[in-house]
């Protein structure tokens, strides 16, 4: 399995819009990507503009399917303060 942690900072005051966009996209992922085992958004308790998307994929093919779907989606609202930082991990346990 492959785990991904994406860190994204919302522009000040744009957190609710970022959450709504992620929520809508997560529904698409749930319906169209059976190899995506987990796809959640988490907000920092210390910094309300800092978010972590935690993703778990069955295999590399599932990651590639997700990336293709993500690149094909219409642009979301302009709510991020910059590009996400992406950490890709091999799940051990």
Residue ranges with predicted function:
Residues 3-8:
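Active-site-flanking beta-strand signature of metal-NTP-handling nucleotidyl enzymes
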Residues 9-18:
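Short, surface-exposed ligand-recognition loops at beta-strand->loop->(often short) alpha-helix junctions
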């Amino acid at each position: 399995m492959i785990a991904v942690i994406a860190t994204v900072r919302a522009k000040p005051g744009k957190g609710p819009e970022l959450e709504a966009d992620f929520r809508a996209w997560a529904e698409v992922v749930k319906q169209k990507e059976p190899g995506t085992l987990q796809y959640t958004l988490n907000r920092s308790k210390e910094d309300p503009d800092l978010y972590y998307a935690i993703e778990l994929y069955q295999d590399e093919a599932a990651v590639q399917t997700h990336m293709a779907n993500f690149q094909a989606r219409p642009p979301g609202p302009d709510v991020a303060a910059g590009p996400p930082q992406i950490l890709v991990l091999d799940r051990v346990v």
